[in-house]
């Protein structure tokens, strides 16, 4: 979600119709620097463990959002604040990533993420997905019942990464990514081999 937020926050800040607030833990502040001057940053003490972070996300964020009069709480992390009905969530991480992972801790993590995502879908005001696949795969068969609450918002490609029309293409593909299963690099290699 960090890369996504670093790219979307300046765009949202440029929209004069929005009053943008960013809730960050102290240990996240440096990651998001520089923050657009039109964004109000709310700093919270860093949490010592994942349970503390989850408690902060689920309790402190909706309380603070209510206090500042926020109309919407946006979460780019598949799930939102379950205690709030003001959520807009972004579905982007496929649960299929855990299939090839033998670690019990990862299975538990992804299972809990699945439960949180399901509950968030039931509570969210709006559900955004990065692709048709993400919408189908991450809504547990509910996509067809969500109607206008669900919307696919394709990320797109920055024009800097599109060749000029007059450039002759060479026969190679440059892929810049980490090796997470959801990147589907194995199938890309098979497709071009």
Give short role names for the model-derived ranges:
Residues 72-74, 81-104:
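Active-site proximal beta-strand in glycosyltransferases
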Residues 11-48, 134:
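N-terminal strand-loop element at the rim of the active site
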Residues 5-8, 12, 173, 188-191:
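A structural motif in glycosyltransferase catalytic domains
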Residues 1-6, 183:
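A short, glycine/small-residue-rich beta-strand->loop->alpha-helix junction that serves as a flexible
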Residues 38-63, 101-106:
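A short, charged, and often flexible helix/loop element on the N-terminal side
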Residues 167-183, 189-192:
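Conserved donor-binding/catalytic core segment of Leloir-type glycosyltransferases
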Residues 133, 156:
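Carbohydrate-associated surface elements
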Residues 107-127:
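Membrane-proximal helix-turn-helix segments that form the acceptor-binding/catalytic region
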């Amino acid at each position: 979600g960090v890369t996504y937020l670093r790219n979307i926050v300046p765009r949202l800040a440029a929209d004069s119709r929005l009053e943008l607030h960013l809730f960050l833990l102290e240990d996240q502040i440096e990651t998001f620097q520089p923050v657009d001057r039109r964004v109000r940053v709310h700093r919270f003490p860093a949490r010592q463990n994942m349970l503390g972070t989850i408690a902060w996300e689920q309790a402190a964020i909706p309380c603070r959002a209510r206090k500042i009069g926020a109309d919407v709480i946006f979460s780019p992390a598949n799930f939102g604040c379950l205690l709030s009905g003001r959520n807009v969530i972004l579905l982007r991480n496929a649960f299929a990533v855990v299939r090839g992972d033998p670690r019990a801790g990862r299975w538990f993590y992804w299972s809990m993420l699945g439960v949180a995502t399901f509950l968030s879908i039931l509570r969210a005001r709006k559900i955004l997905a990065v692709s048709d696949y993400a919408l189908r795969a991450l809504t547990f068969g509910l996509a067809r019942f969500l109607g206008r609450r669900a919307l696919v918002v394709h990320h797109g490609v920055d024009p800097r990464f599109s060749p000029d029309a007059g450039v002759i293409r060479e026969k190679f593909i440059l892929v810049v990514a980490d090796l997470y299963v959801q990147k589907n690099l194995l199938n890309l290699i098979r497709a071009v081999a």
